[in-house]
A protein has these predicted regions:
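Amphipathic alpha-helical segments used for helix-helix packing
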Residues: 52, 79-82, 91-114
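Short, basic, alpha-helical segments at the C-terminal edge of helix-turn-helix-like DNA-binding modules
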Residues: 56-62
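N-terminal intrinsically disordered/low-complexity leader segments
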Residues: 1-3
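Helix-turn-helix
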Residues: 7, 11-54
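Amphipathic C-terminal alpha-helical segment
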Residues: 89-90, 105, 149-167, 180-182
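Amphipathic alpha-helical interaction segments
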Residues: 78, 82, 102, 143-150, ...
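Amphipathic alpha-helical packing segments from all-alpha helical-bundle domains
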Residues: 64, 109-135, 143-146, 170-180
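Hydrophobic alpha-helical connector segments
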Residues: 67-96, 145-148
C-alpha cells in the first residue's frame, strides 16, 4: 500500500526506464503504481514533470550515498572497487537502463538539464577526487574519471543492445583495472 510519496518512486522509476518520459502516460503510471489520477496529483501536484524530477532526485540521492560520497571520502583503494560493485548492482549487471542517461539523450534533456548535468558532473568530480587522492595527477585523474563514466554508460548501452550482461561485467572489470592502475 502506498502511504507516502516516496513509496511511489520505485514504480515511477521503472515506468520511466521502460517507456521514457513521453511514453509514460498517466494511465500507465496509475496502472503500475496502483494509484488513481487524484492520488498521483496529491503526491505530485506538478504532474508527470514533478514525478520525473522526484525520480531523478531519488537517483541522485542513491548515487550520492553509495558512490559519490565514498569516492570523495574513503580510501580510493576501497572506494573505486566499491563503486564498480555498486554500479554493477544498481544497473543489474547492465540489464537496467540508466534513466539519467536516457533522459540526457531524449527530447526531455532541456527540461531536466540541471539534474542531468549535476548527476554526471558529481560522478566525474567524485571519481576524479578519489583518483587524485590515490596519487594521480589532477589532469590524469580527471581524464580517467571522464573516461570511466563514459565507458560505464557505453557498457550499459552495449549490454542492453546485445542482451548480454556478460559484456557489462567484462567492461566493468576493465574499467576497474584502468582506474586502479598506477
Amino acid at each position: 500500500m502506498v502511504a507516502e510519496r516516496a513509496d511511489v518512486l520505485p514504480a515511477l522509476s521503472e515506468v520511466f526506464r521502460e517507456h521514457g518520459y513521453e511514453g509514460a502516460s498517466l494511465a500507465l503510471i496509475g496502472q503500475r503504481t496502483g494509484l488513481g489520477k487524484g492520488s498521483l496529483y496529491h503526491f505530485f501536484p506538478g504532474g508527470k514533470e514533478e514525478m520525473a524530477a522526484a525520480v531523478l532526485a531519488e537517483i541522485d540521492s542513491w548515487f550520492e550515498q553509495h558512490i559519490f560520497r565514498p569516492l570523495r571520502e574513503e580510501d580510493p583503494r576501497r572506494a573505486v572497487p566499491g563503486m564498480v560493485r555498486s554500479v554493477d548492482g544498481y544497473f543489474r549487471s547492465g540489464c537496467r537502463v540508466c534513466l539519467v542517461g536516457a533522459f540526457a539523450l531524449g527530447d526531455v534533456r532541456d527540461r531536466f538539464a540541471d539534474a542531468i548535468r549535476g548527476y554526471f558532473a558529481a560522478w566525474t568530480d567524485a571519481l576524479a577526487q578519489g583518483l587524485e587522492r590515490g596519487g594521480l595527477a589532477e589532469d590524469a585523474a580527471r581524464d580517467r574519471a571522464e573516461e570511466a563514466v563514459a565507458a560505464i554508460q557505453g557498457a550499459l548501452v552495449l549490454a542492453r543492445a546485445l542482451d548480454e550482461p556478460g559484456s557489462f561485467h567484462r567492461a566493468m572489470a576493465r574499467i576497474e583495472a584502468r582506474l586502479t592502475a598506477p
